[in-house]
Curated annotation (Swiss-Prot):
CDD domains: MFS_XylE_like. GO terms for molecular function: D-glucose transmembrane transporter activity. InterPro entries: MFS_dom (IPR020846), MFS_sugar_transport-like (IPR005828), MFS_Sugar_Transporter (IPR050820), MFS_trans_sf (IPR036259), Sugar/inositol_transpt (IPR003663), Sugar_transporter_CS (IPR005829), XylE-like (IPR047984). The lineage of its organism: Bacteria, Bacillati, Bacillota, Bacilli, Bacillales. The keyword Cell wall biogenesis/degradation does not apply. Belongs to the major facilitator superfamily. Sugar transporter (TC 2.A.1.1) family. NCBIfam families: SP. It is found in: Cell membrane. This is Putative metabolite transport protein YncC. It is a multi-pass membrane protein. Keywords: Cell membrane, Membrane, Transmembrane, Transmembrane helix, Transport. It comes from Bacillus subtilis (strain 168). Signal peptide: none annotated. GO terms for cellular component: membrane; plasma membrane.
Amino acid sequence: MDMNEHRNRRLKLIMISATFGGLLFGYDTGVINGALPFMARPDQLDLTPVTEGLVTSILLLGAAFGALLCGRLADRYGRRKMILNLSFLFFLASLGTALAPNVFIMAVFRFLLGLAVGGASAMVPAFLAEMAPHEKRGRMVTQNELMIVGGQFLAYVFNAILGVTMANTGHVWRYMLVICAVPAIMLFASMLKVPESPRWLISKGKNSEALRVLKQIREDKRAEAECREIQEAVEKDTALEKASLKDFSTPWLRRLLWIGIGVAIVNQITGVNSIMYYGTQILKESGFGTKAALIANIGNGLISVIAVIFGIWLVGKVRRRPILLIGLAGTTTALLLIAIFSIVLDGSMALPYVVLSLTVLFLAFMQGCVGPVTWLVIAEIFPQRLRGLGSGISVFFLWILNFVIGFAFPILLSSVGLSFTFFIFVALGVLAIGFVYKFMPETKGRTLEELEEHFRSRHDHNTPEQSVIEV
């Protein structure tokens, strides 16, 4: 085996190991979709629309704080160490949810599981962005998105198998939830073989160790040049005080933070997680039975996987901004059609199949365009010293909005119906398109250090009135 092949295999091992965090993220957020109908039974947890929303969304609230907390801790203790600790939390919380005797205990462990999900959502993309060469960064970071939707797909498949074969077993939802403990063990075992981020090592003065890591995944001369480039960027940062919220009072950093938060919000106001968490209920609302809805929901998971594979190829070829704009136009149109047909075909036998087809179309645009670019841009735009904090804050807002949507959706669905609920998401989708067109910068084709220098120097030389669209 020649050295280049060895380095590529090493880089692939790093990517696969870290993205088990994405798989856990996906399974834990997707499994509730099929578990809820069984969990809600009177002889189980006896859930109401409000407690359904609570059990679903408390994980998302935990994820918001997990992203914020883990971002700071990772800047202090390292990306790899945080991911290892998160694997233990995934394992513990998975067992807790599977064994929960009542709604209160379930909510506690779902919150703890959320801390792990949120931490992984912030840490894994940042870790991959720091390990990847710039020409592979887009594909490597979006592999995490593939693992997220792969985890959701596996959750839907296991839900359907268990839900159909054990439909008369009330506690079948416990088997659905405990499966998540397996990838948690795999994440821990695989991350033991992965090195720390060289950018984090240099930020802590461990330059020789960072160079050794870079030489494992880069050609020697390139590793040395990249090491010097990172050191120069870190030296500029160390002239400043320790990373804190005060840093974002600097105009160019404040602008990047608002862009990061904005892109995170854009991801959620598409309404994607109303479908990912409540797809089974949406299909039941449109006319499917419980078993048919569980099986049909596999289609949503499968198209998500196919779309992300396409998205990984796309981000390697096309700029970030047009991908995101096209994706948002597609998701907004699909939701508009669901809302319209829910009125026009109300009571028709065709409605459930039309809704299923349109949710598949929605997810094709969402997972192929919107999702990959969202996580990639959040991982790219912040400078090294503030990457953990900036990513953590951005992802915090993503999860807070996710929590609001996850909690409110079943209540909206039961009170105002499917069509009006989706009309709300259509209006928000139009606002999202406007934000991306006006404010989101282009980040493709530059190293993380080049992006940092570009954003910094652009603010120094440009007038405040100039739009970020020019970046």
